[in-house]
Amino acid sequence: CLEKGVSTIFFSATLLPVQYYKEVLSGNQEEYAVYVPSPFDASRRLLAVGRDVSSRYKRRNSREYWKILNYILTAARARKGNYLVYFPSYAYMNEVYSLYQTMGEQQDVEIAVQSGNMKEDDREAFLEKFREKRERSLAAFCVMGGIFSEGIDLKGEQLIGGLVVGTGLA
């Protein structure tokens, strides 16, 4: 299908390694590629992995959901701020959120949840939560690949962390 155009531009922050994708997408190693360094200081990045949990279908049960919720709350309590939490599906996200609701009001962590039928006003209201001054942490539950996975701009302290539940590796 690429032959029909005069040129094609692939734009992504995730197409690494570039040489591999140049071969797969165009077959021509001579294609032009631009490498842009990350604007984020790598020394300020923390990567933590919960090895005792899994998002595999056969392990999806309330015990796993409780462990995942505990990880989310622990992260959000460690430093007050706004966090995005990505889940592999709405069903998985809603299971974890249902458990949170049974705990009663958490004094130090507020949860916001993406719904599957958000209109533009709903999306704006969801993102506005990150701009509000708040007394407690916000953990915003979203779905991987959904409307809040790309193309949002949360600057400075509007977003201080991200958590991914189920990377497909465990």
Feature roles, as predicted:
Residues 1-170:
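ASCE RecA-like P-loop NTPase motor cores
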